[in-house]
Amino acid sequence: MEKDVEIGIFGGTGIYDSGLLEDAKEVDIDTPYGKPSDTITVGTFKGRKIAFLPRHGKKHTIPPHMINFKANIWAFKELGVTRIIAPSAVGSLKEELAPGHFVLPTQFLDFTKSRDGSFSEDGRVIHISVADPFCPELQSSITEVTDSLDMNIHKDCTYVCIEGPRFSTKAESKFYRTTGADIIGMTLVPECQLAREAQICYASISTVTDYDVWAEKPVTAKEVLETLSKNVEGTKKILTELIEKIPKDRSCSCAKALEEAEF
């Protein structure tokens, strides 16, 4: 099995293939938590070893509440991944975050209900810190890239994660707005906190597809896909520039996340 992969990319809604990888091959991994969402594509790009996994499966057959997040993170860890970039589709909770805009979340609010969000089991108790859930080093690299590309990306935003797969009611959407959160989606949690437990750096690049339902126009899956199809090239452009900007050595604290987390 490959053990020297540096960077893992989780494909979100609208991004189902790696596209940019050279010498790509499919890797099938079994984990203690079952199978990942699909086979993992491993290849190289600009001299960096990359693993790509669409979290919904290559044919988008896995709804958000049924994603095997633990298997996905474990599989990346098995390959040697130390950094994860996670594109995703989100709804906007604020008028200034318009469809087509990119968002760099720095905090989350967890409204999921039935997801297994920890590797803490079999007598191992982990109280991981997610005070700052995302790797500052990765976020800095993303900001550097989007600034150089003159792309409109909103920073310091809070992501509301809901269970799905249904969209919110109008009452729920208006409630989430009262929390001060900026965007809403279905996949960030527990993905980011499992990455922290695995001591893997993690950052999300979110694409706004709609105004949820607070704006009185109900969101539809068709609307989400139409917006994503227009913006997928923007996401790929960010990834293309980002991969070579990520430092080879880590200077963040993500690699030491368990040192003060276990009893």
Curated annotation (Swiss-Prot):
SS bond partners: none
Binding site for substrate: M186, D210, Y211, D212
Presence of keyword RNA-binding: no
Reactions it catalyzes: S-methyl-5'-thioadenosine + phosphate = 5-(methylsulfanyl)-alpha-D-ribose 1-phosphate + adenine
GO cellular component, one term: cytosol
Binding site for phosphate: T13, R55, H56, S88, A89, T187
A GO BP entry: purine ribonucleoside salvage
Top enzyme class: transferase
Membrane-spanning intervals of the chain: none
EC number(s) given by UniProt: 2.4.2.28
Keyword annotations: Glycosyltransferase, Purine salvage, Transferase
SUPFAM superfamilies for this protein: Purine and uridine phosphorylases (SSF53167)
Biological role stated in the UniProt entry: Catalyzes the reversible phosphorylation of S-methyl-5'-thioadenosine (MTA) to adenine and 5-methylthioribose-1-phosphate. Involved in the breakdown of MTA, a major by-product of polyamine biosynthesis. Responsible for the first step in the methionine salvage pathway after MTA has been generated from S-adenosylmethionine. Has broad substrate specificity with 6-aminopurine nucleosides as preferred substrates.
Subunit structure: Homohexamer. Dimer of a homotrimer.
Protein name: S-methyl-5'-thioadenosine phosphorylase
Lineage: Archaea, Nitrososphaerota, Nitrososphaeria, Nitrosopumilales, Nitrosopumilaceae
